[in-house]
Swiss-Prot record:
NCBIfam families: tigrfam_recA. It is found in: Cytoplasm. The lineage of its organism: Bacteria, Pseudomonadati, Pseudomonadota, Alphaproteobacteria, Rhodospirillales. This is Protein RecA. InterPro entries: AAA+_ATPase, DNA_recomb/repair_RecA, DNA_recomb/repair_RecA_CS, P-loop_NTPase, RecA-like_C, RecA-like_N, RecA_ATP-bd, RecA_C_sf. The gene is recA. ATP binds at residues 77-84. Can catalyze the hydrolysis of ATP in the presence of single-stranded DNA, the ATP-dependent uptake of single-stranded DNA by duplex DNA, and the ATP-dependent hybridization of homologous single-stranded DNAs. It interacts with LexA causing its activation and leading to its autocatalytic cleavage. Disruption phenotype: Cells are more sensitive to UV and MMS, and have no detectable recombinase activity. They are still able to generate phase variants, as do wild-type cells, and surprisingly do so at a 10-fold greater rate. Phase variants irreversibly lose the ability to swim, and undergo changes in their sugar assimilation profile. Belongs to the RecA family. It comes from the Bacteria.
Length: 359
């Protein structure tokens, strides 16, 4: 390349840089400092803060160690599958870290004694039980904009009744009103959620579409807007019961990460939700320990580091509950082998995925 061509290239690049600097200074004068910047200039834009779900397996399945702050998360599933339990666990974890949490109880069904059993400090938890959907979302917007809230839970999207529907007759048709309400609210909320670094969890219910011959007839309420705005979507299902002799003492639960903008999606994790206790930590340590090669299972016997823990899963869980030092050691080794465990959780869109994922 000749010297004349080199000078031309340098002149072009200098002109481009000057034009860019002029554009950036004009934008900052018009909209304020910080309205535009290089992506790596702010650490909090690169490093995502997370809040644990209360489930070690689900934290690993999410790929980043928990639910991302400054983002929208949707948890949906059938009735009594553990949606509110999972949200309350996230609140408890945030409170342990010194955070302030709020719960918008549109269903008017939050049980304070159950929340306390899960580790929630109900004396510090802000709660609102609004009458109309507009009121609920306005309260949520005000709390998020304050910048003082770490976790905000809306339970549930299906219970956010538009005011026009409340004031109308029982048989009136309000086509698309709920979906429009959610779409408008999310357009307003999404910017302030990111700026305030608040985790907003929307709990949602599922419905069946009429006349679907092929594919999955299930859908979530509130239209399509939430599916687009959510960074993480969790499909939670009850897959069985846990019995102590003839008494049912808990549920076996499966969670699928249906959408994940932060890490690879479609990971599936199973854990126990015990009545009055929530997610069983010791049950997870056994299951994940086997996947990570930390806990050995031979027949009905569980053993760790050459020591027999117990015969049968429930006996092994009791042993770990009574020996917290061993439980902590197993947890540390599982966290050390998190990559191996995450690979074992990887599902596919087809296997219990797109075919069974509500649209």
């Amino acid at each position: 390349m000749s010297s004349a061509q080199l000078r031309l290239v340098e002149k072009d690049s200098m002109d481009k840089q000057k034009a860019l600097d002029a554009a950036l200074s004009q934008i900052e004068r018009a909209f304020g400092k910080g309205s535009i910047m290089k992506l790596g200039a702010r650490e909090n834009l690169v490093e995502t803060e997370v809040i644990s779900t209360g489930s070690l397996g689900l934290d690993i399945a999410l790929g980043i160690g928990g639910l991302p702050k400054g983002r929208i998360v949707e948890i949906y599933g059938p009735e009594s599958s553990g949606k509110t339990t999972l949200a309350l666990h996230a609140i408890a974890q945030a409170q342990k870290a010194g955070g302030t949490c709020a719960f918008v109880d549109a269903e008017h069904a939050l049980d304070p004694s159950y929340a306390r059993k899960l580790g929630v400090n109900i004396d510090e938890l802000l709660i609102s039980q609004p009458d109309a959907g507009e009121q609920a979302l306005e309260i949520a917007d005000t709390l998020v904009r304050s910048g003082a809230i770490d976790v905000l839970v809306v339970d549930s999207v299906a219970a956010l009744v538009p005011r026009a529907e409340l004031e109308g007759e029982m048989g009136d048709s309000h086509v698309g009103l709920h979906a429009r309400l959610m779409s408008q609210a999310l357009r307003k909320l999404t910017g302030s959620i990111s700026k305030s670094n608040c985790l907003v969890i929307f709990i949602n219910q599922i419905r069946l579409k009429i006349g679907v011959m092929f594919g999955n007839p299930e859908t979530t309420t509130g239209g399509n807007a939430l599916k687009f705005y959510a960074s993480v979507r969790l499909d939670i299902r009850r897959i069985g019961s846990i019995k102590d002799r003839d008494t049912v003492v808990g549920n076996q639960t499966r969670v699928k990460v249906v959408k994940n903008k932060m890490a690879p999606p479609f990971r599936v994790v199973e854990f126990d939700i015990m009545y009055g206790e929530g997610v069983s930590k010791v049950g997870e340590l056994l299951d994940l320990g086997i996947q990570a090669g930390v806990v050995d299972k031979s027949g009905a016997w569980f053993s760790y580091d050459g020591t027999r823990i117990g015969q049968g899963r429930e006996n092994a869980k009791t042993y770990l509950r009574n020996n917290p030092e061993m439980a902590d050691a197993i947890e540390a080794k599982i966290r050390g082998n998190a990559g191996l465990v995450a690979d074992a959780m990887m599902g596919t869109p087809e296997a219990d995925g797109e075919a069974s994922t509500p649209e």
